[in-house]
């Protein structure tokens, strides 16, 4: 989501790679940082979530990747479907294509799991 142009570049120059997305539909890797900054600035840390969620609509990362010339699958919400998707993706990488598998994971803190 940060740079869709990087997806295009990999497709244009035929860079075979596999990206498996840990998609919690949020920028939660930045959550604690936002709280620290809010506290340092004396602002309300309960508002730190603003701009962190990627919901309504949920981005179609597989669709974005396909639009840039990638083979892509997802969003995958059932953990039982991941293994087969990875096999298909690996076959594409072996053919010299970039592949993306979007796995939707549980939101929030704690052990990461598919929903």
Give short role names for the model-derived ranges.
Residues 1-115:
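Thiamine diphosphate
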């Amino acid at each position: 989501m940060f740079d869709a142009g990087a997806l295009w570049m990999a497709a244009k120059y035929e860079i075979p790679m596999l990206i498996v997305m840990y998609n919690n539909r949020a920028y939660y890797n930045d959550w604690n940082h936002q709280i620290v900054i809010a506290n340092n600035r004396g602002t309300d840390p309960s508002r730190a979530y603003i701009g962190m969620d990627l919901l309504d609509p949920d981005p179609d990362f597989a669709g974005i990747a396909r639009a840039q010339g990638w083979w892509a699958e997802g969003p995958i919400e059932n953990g039982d479907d991941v293994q087969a998707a990875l096999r298909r993706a690996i076959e594409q990488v072996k053919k010299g294509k970039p592949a993306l598998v979007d796995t939707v994971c549980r939101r929030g803190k704690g052990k990461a799991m598919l929903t």
